[in-house]
Amino acid sequence: MNLPNKLTVLRCIMTPLFLLALLWAFPYHYVAALVLFSAASLTDLFDGKIARARGLVTNLGKFLDPLADKTLTTAAFLGFMVKLPGAGLCWAVMLILTREFMVTSVRLLAAKDGVVIAASMAGKAKTVLQMVSILYMLAALQAGELIGEGALTSGLLIAGQVLIWIAVAATVISGIQYVWACRRYFTDRADDVR
């Protein structure tokens, strides 16, 4: 296994550690979650750069990298649902999960035909927006823990929710683009069923 793929696997390993830090209340657990999420996000930045610079792009990497991204960001959004149950994030998470399952299904259908669908620019932008909104929300949660409840904490959390909904919009748009670009995998399969 080459270095970029090892970084991707490392991101997968860091995901449950991040989720544990997010959900398990211990002193500065949001800081620990923020550090773990930041480190995992950096592996996403570096695995692709190293793979392209050194000519180490593989089909495994093209398939595993977006899957590792989905796992990391989904864990964060599910964690936020648990930590902020009244924040209306359930719908955001449902839209994100629907898009992720849909795109993963398209990738699996394509893989059956020997085609590996790499992440598109819209998909990469979606991932960046999701990661930024998650990082902001982790910082806002930690700030809220330090300064206590009040107008400032509420404002920080509302701004975080707005960022999450911006990421949701990008998620839905990129999902529609993926399905449209890969619609032949649906029509071909539908013809096979008839």
PLM regions with names:
Residues 1-5, 14-15, 25, 34-41, ...:
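C-terminal membrane-associated helical module and adjoining short loops/tails
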Residues 4-7, 79:
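Multi-pass alpha-helical membrane architecture of UbiA-family
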Residues 60-116:
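Helix-adjacent hinge/juxtasegments
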